[in-house]
Amino acid sequence: MKILGIDPGTKNCGYAILEKSKFKTILLEAGLIKIKPNTLQYQITELCEGLDLIFKNHKFDEVAIEDIFFAYNPKTVLKLAQFRGALSLKILQLHGDFAEYTPLQVKKTVTGKAKADKEQVAFMVKKILGINKEIKPLDITDAIAIALTHANNLRIN
């Protein structure tokens, strides 16, 4: 089963592709859709074009995305919500249904602690998948954690 995990952001959008079998989970690919500073419309276009490319190169059984987190800056929340809306529409067009997980759900699944920081998540992602090299930036490890959370949720259900 091939799972795409997506960590939406306004500067970078992390993505990770996992192959899950009955006995193991393998990281096939992970990276960033880089979003250059520009008008919101062009940034959303870049995000959607990046997602198009990922779906053009892969077929997925499942897609999971991180839900919007709480932020203190209303402008940031509004921009992220617009990115998230465009991303949701694009995923529905390219794939269909997708799963959503809050940051707390992802942290709890991967580290066992809902209040874990990004470095703890990155450490556990590498440990779970048996990866020895550093994975940067943290947007990528977050995307992997989202995919792992979905893989775990599928196993439970």
UniProtKB/Swiss-Prot annotation:
It catalyses: Endonucleolytic cleavage at a junction such as a reciprocal single-stranded crossover between two homologous DNA duplexes (Holliday junction). Binds 2 Mg(2+) ion per subunit. Keywords: Cytoplasm, DNA damage, DNA recombination, DNA repair, DNA-binding, Endonuclease, Hydrolase, Magnesium, Metal-binding, Nuclease. Homodimer which binds Holliday junction (HJ) DNA. The HJ becomes 2-fold symmetrical on binding to RuvC with unstacked arms; it has a different conformation from HJ DNA in complex with RuvA. In the full resolvosome a probable DNA-RuvA(4)-RuvB(12)-RuvC(2) complex forms which resolves the HJ. Mg(2+) 2 binds at residue 66. One of its GO terms (molecular function) is magnesium ion binding. InterPro entries: RNaseH-like_sf (IPR012337), RNaseH_sf (IPR036397), X-over_junc_endoDNase_Mg_BS (IPR020563), X-over_junc_endoDNase_RuvC (IPR002176). This is Crossover junction endodeoxyribonuclease RuvC. It comes from Campylobacter concisus (strain 13826). The RuvA-RuvB-RuvC complex processes Holliday junction (HJ) DNA during genetic recombination and DNA repair. Endonuclease that resolves HJ intermediates. Cleaves cruciform DNA by making single-stranded nicks across the HJ at symmetrical positions within the homologous arms, yielding a 5'-phosphate and a 3'-hydroxyl group; requires a central core of homology in the junction. The consensus cleavage sequence is 5'-(A/T)TT(C/G)-3'. Cleavage occurs on the 3'-side of the TT dinucleotide at the point of strand exchange. GO terms for biological process: DNA recombination; DNA repair. Coiled coil: none annotated. Its main location: cytoplasm. It is found in: Cytoplasm. The active site is at residues 7, 66, 139. GO terms for cellular component: cytoplasm; Holliday junction resolvase complex. Pfam families: RuvC (PF02075). The keyword Magnesium applies. Its EC number is 3.1.21.10. Its cofactor is Mg(2+). It is an enzyme of class 3 (hydrolase).
